[in-house]
């Protein structure tokens, strides 16, 4: 049975399958096949009978006819050619039965019309002229040139000059159409038909294979046009391939090969260089495909030869194995691209760096989307080394990726793996790494961790187990023993229900140990490292989970850094002070440590932040103020507390409005917690002793009680309305109700919320600035004042003589002297 190969699109194929008749059962198909075989054998037998009998009858009839025509003097060949076919059909019709005759009539072909004029010399000459003309026209078209319009240019005189150029005419190659027509009877109309998807031509890039290579000199404009056309063509091709993969990935796994060819520098199929834009598109497209079709679970290895599987399970396992192989091949190609810029002696051109950046970003996307799929740990290991590369854009991408993984990882397995690899990298490089290797650890969620809870749970479980064993060995009454045993089993089950939490807590504890190992190694071995600022920031962030045994040594190290290193910046100093006060405000309260020297460091660096590039660093001061003025206010003397209030309000004058609001919020909270600061609202300077020295760095001896908060008068006329209301509120003694009270929506905000909500770095002013009122400005007529008293008289004489005329322009602001002197 012949098959008909028809190329149709997916839409037509779906419509054909939809409108196709209901498929036959197996028995009906077997009967139909037997019927076709019988019909075919009968046809062959009929042809054999026809060939044997017709040959004898034909020879006899021809001999009789030849003799008759020869007796009449005619040429027997001409008549034979005309009537031979008709006599043959008549003779055969007599021999065949009804079924064979119907079959032959259905399959007979019409006789071809006899060509006339073969021996006519004029007609042959005309045919030769036509062929010569066609060949000459083809040669002219081959050598023909067409005109292309170029971009116009503008001359110095301002004239637009159009430009054209001539390029050789290249005819489009004609595609050969192969139409296979086979004759079938009516019983074969419902047979199977083989269809070929039209997307195969796009996947195999038939258009590029059939295009004739052009080897000639071309202009820059033609080159750019050809490049853009190639990009658009490959865009369309990539879209077709990706849509097929997303539609049914089980049947389209071979399409990955076409995308991998576009990722290479040289296309293996066409042996031509791929454009850089096409390579980037191919990498991004494959990444998006894997993000969609990869499963959330880890694919296991199943040996289909040793195990007997069901058909559905076998199909799934086959698909997963093929998908895993394609994913592995894709990761190998990405690793080859990044190795060109990461290894020594690699090709580090701007194009390869950009391509490697795209590859790194794609690996980051895969790590975030599927952190526990196969081979993803290899991605994480490669990205850890890219975190210390020499390209800031790649480091930023990996840094953001790791922070996202740390915040979204609930199982903590990938987080622990990444932290271990970072620790190994820093140890191998001897702390000579980029800052991103340390700052990415700030995304870890280890703020609410109790390291002593693990030991308590272990002791509790051991006690319950021993108590259960004692109850089982007792020889009391059965009912009483069963009752107690039930209660103990219930408590034991509750303890076992927390095993998952304990396993997670154990991983979190391991992460904390690894992080502080990194921090303490840098502080001990290389305190002058360029990552010291990031180390101190991390210590300030996670100081509440540091073990109590390390507190004394850590405070001594930080104090030595503050005093010995003169080149230490204000940011590092603020982080040191913040870390120390976080330690002392928590479990470090039991330590006998006097933080007076750290008060002086903090008081000295409070004015380092201003409304400029470092204004965002004021958040560090806010966090430290929360530890110093709020949590440790009872451990501070009145003089020190007043000195901090005065310096804080002085520093608010050269901050942006959100920093000023955060400062006033801290002062308001401190005023509400203590009544000692009410003396600063009194302008009587005889209360304190001595004179206030604002330049003294020791807050204990600057005599802040001898001054007042005069800055509130300036802030009451601030450009921001909320600052004005807050300053008036503090000046009235922070009343809850009455005159000077704040609205509820402002009074409930903390200093950190005020600093964030009123931030205008995104070009959004809070509250919204009202629009100006619409209207035209009124022109005010001015009044002239004469310096010379006799000027009016002299000008009046000129008017009388007619030498000065009256002005008619009423829209100007000039003085009309004529009307003024009338």
Swiss-Prot record:
Query: Compositional bias (Basic and acidic residues) at which positions?
Result: 35-45
- Is Coiled coil tagged as a keyword? yes
Basic residues composition bias: which ranges?
Answer: 13-23
Q: Where is this region: Disordered?
A: 1-86, 106-142, 172-199
The compartments listed are:
Nucleus, Nucleolus
Q: Which GO BP terms apply?
A: DNA replication initiation
**Family annotation (InterPro entries):** ARM-type_fold, CCAAT-binding_factor, Noc3_N, Nucleolar_cplx-assoc_3
Q: Which UniProt keywords apply?
A: Coiled coil, Nucleus, Phosphoprotein
**Pfam families from the UniProt entry:** CBF, NOC3p
The effect of disrupting this gene, in the record's words, is:
Ubiquitous RNAi-mediated knock-down is lethal between first and second instar with reduced larval size. Conditional RNAi-mediated knock-down in proliferating cells of the eye and antenna imaginal discs is viable but results in small eye size and disorganized ommatidia, possibly due to excessive apoptosis. Conditional RNAi-mediated knock-down in cells of the prothoracic gland impedes pupation, probably due to reduced ecdysone hormone levels.
Protein origin, superkingdom: Eukaryota
Modified residue Phosphothreonine is at which positions? 193
Task: List the PANTHER family hit by this protein, alphabetically.
Answer: NUCLEOLAR COMPLEX PROTEIN 3 (PTHR14428), NUCLEOLAR COMPLEX PROTEIN 3 HOMOLOG (PTHR14428:SF5)
UniProt family annotation:
Belongs to the CBF/MAK21 family.
Q: What is this protein called?
A: Nucleolar complex protein 3
Source species, please? Drosophila melanogaster (Fruit fly)
Gene name?
A: Noc3
């Amino acid at each position: 049975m012949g098959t008909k190969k028809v190329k149709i699109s997916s839409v037509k194929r779906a419509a054909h399958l939809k409108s196709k008749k209901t498929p036959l059962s197996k028995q009906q198909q077997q009967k139909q096949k037997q019927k076709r075989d019988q019909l075919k054998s009968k046809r062959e037998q009929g042809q054999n009978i026809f060939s044997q009998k017709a040959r004898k009858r034909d020879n006899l009839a021809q001999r009789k006819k030849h003799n008759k025509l020869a007796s009449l003097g005619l040429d027997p060949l001409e008549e034979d050619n005309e009537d031979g076919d008709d006599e043959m059909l008549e003779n055969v019709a007599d021999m065949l039965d009804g079924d064979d005759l119907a079959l032959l009539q259905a399959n007979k072909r019409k006789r071809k019309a006899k060509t006339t004029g073969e021996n006519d010399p004029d007609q042959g000459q005309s045919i030769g002229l036509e062929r010569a003309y066609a060949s000459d026209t083809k040669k002219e078209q081959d050598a023909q040139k067409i005109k292309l319009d170029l971009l116009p240019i503008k001359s110095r005189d301002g004239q637009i000059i159009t430009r054209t150029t001539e390029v050789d005419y290249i005819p489009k190659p004609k595609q050969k159409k192969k139409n296979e027509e086979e004759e079938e009877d009516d019983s074969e109309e419902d047979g199977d038909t083989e269809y070929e998807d039209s997307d195969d031509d796009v996947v195999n890039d038939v258009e590029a294979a059939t295009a004739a290579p052009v080897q000639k000199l071309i202009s820059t404009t033609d080159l750019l046009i050809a490049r853009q056309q190639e990009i658009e063509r490959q865009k369309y091709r990539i879209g077709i391939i990706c849509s097929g993969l997303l539609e049914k990935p089980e049947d389209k796994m071979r399409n990955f090969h076409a995308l991998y060819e576009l990722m290479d520098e040289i296309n293996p199929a066409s042996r031509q260089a791929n454009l850089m834009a096409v390579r980037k598109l191919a990498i991004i497209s494959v990444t998006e495909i894997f993000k969609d079709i990869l499963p959330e679970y880890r694919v296991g290895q199943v040996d289909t030869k040793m195990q007997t599987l069901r058909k559905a399970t076998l199909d799934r396992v086959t698909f997963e194995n093929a998908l895993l192989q394609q994913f592995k091949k894709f990761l190998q190609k990405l690793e080859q691209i990044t190795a060109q810029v990461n290894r020594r002696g690699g090709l580090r051109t701007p194009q390869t760096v950009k391509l490697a950046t795209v590859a790194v970003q794609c690996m980051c996307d895969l790590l975030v989307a599927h952190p526990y799929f196969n081979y993803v740990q290899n991605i994480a290991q490669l990205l850890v080394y890219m975190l210390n590369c020499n390209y800031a854009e790649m480091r930023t991408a990996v840094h953001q990726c790791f922070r996202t993984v740390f915040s979204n990882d609930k199982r903590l397995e990938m987080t622990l793996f990444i932290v271990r690899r970072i620790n190994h990298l820093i140890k191998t490089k001897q702390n000579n790494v980029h800052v991103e290797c340390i700052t990415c650890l700030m995304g870890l969620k280890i703020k609410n961790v109790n390291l002593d809870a693990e030991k308590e749970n272990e002791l509790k479980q051991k006690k319950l187990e021993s108590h259960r064993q004692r109850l089982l060995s007792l020889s009391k009454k059965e009912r009483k023993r069963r009752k107690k045993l039930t209660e103990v089993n219930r408590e034991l089950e509750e303890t076992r229900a927390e095993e998952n939490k304990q396993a997670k807590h154990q991983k979190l504890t391991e992460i904390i140990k690894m992080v502080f190992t990194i921090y303490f190694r840098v502080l001990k071995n290389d305190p002058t490292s360029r990552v010291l600022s990031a180390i101190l920031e991390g210590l300030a962030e996670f100081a509440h989970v540091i073990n109590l045994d390390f507190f004394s040594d850590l405070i001594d190290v930080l104090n030595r850094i503050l005093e010995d290193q003169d080149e230490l910046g204000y940011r590092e100093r603020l982080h040191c002070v913040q870390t120390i006060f976080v330690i002392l405000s928590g479990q470090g309260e039991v330590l006998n440590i006097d933080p007076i020297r750290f008060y002086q460091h903090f008081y000295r660096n409070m004015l380092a932040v201003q409304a400029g590039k470092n204004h965002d660093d004021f958040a560090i001061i806010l966090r430290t103020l929360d530890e110093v003025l709020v949590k440790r206010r009872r451990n501070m003397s009145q003089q020190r507390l007043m000195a901090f209030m005065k310096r804080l309000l002085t520093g608010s004058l050269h901050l942006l409005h959100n920093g000023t609001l955060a400062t006033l919020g801290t002062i308001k909270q401190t005023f509400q917690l203590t009544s000692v600061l009410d003396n600063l609202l009194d302008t009587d300077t005889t209360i304190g002793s001595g004179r206030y020295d604002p330049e003294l760095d020791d807050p204990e001896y600057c005599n802040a009680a001898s001054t007042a908060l005069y800055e509130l008068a300036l802030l009451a006329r601030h450009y921001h309305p909320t600052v004005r209301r807050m300053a008036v509120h503090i000046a009235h003694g922070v009343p809850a109700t009455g005159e000077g009270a704040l609205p509820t929506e402002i009074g409930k905000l903390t200093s950190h919320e005020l600093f964030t909500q009123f931030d205008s770095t995104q070009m959004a002013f809070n509250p919204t600035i009202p629009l100006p009122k619409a209207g035209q400005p009124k022109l005010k007529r001015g009044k002239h004042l004469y310096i010379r008293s006799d000027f009016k008289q002299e000008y009046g004489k000129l008017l009388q003589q007619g030498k000065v005329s009256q002005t008619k322009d009423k829209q100007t602001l000039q003085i009309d002297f004529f009307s003024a002197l009338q």
